[in-house]
């Protein structure tokens, strides 16, 4: 998954006030200098501000970070909401497409998670009588079908999938907990 996935530069025009128009450039990953300001007024005349987060400094003195431009000085709530929603999206994307079982990519959409849980629960409740069960892994272009014939094998798959989800969630919570809004305060 590339840095900043699934975000690209998006431009949106909004009307506010007395028919005034503002243009917002939505979240993008930027390459720049290490030590970059997390909040910066880039154009005082037009009241343009940039918010930066997820700064990843590199050995060569440069840095990569996410950035969003505002047509006004963003409030604490706007900054917090922006960064938290980005971390939530990153966590969701990692859960959705980051798990593999025995080398096969497993798409963990909410629907698939529900189907895996239902199949596992039913197999446990019936002592494996509902087996075999077949799941499609991989992609639509390169599907890999896996048939679970033994309860232990299905249990192994399901507990690894749940463990992966829990690990990714914990990593996302840790990043969100480390976010410090005080670093964005400018007097």
What are these regions (language model features)?
Residues 1-187:
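A preference for well-ordered globular domain cores
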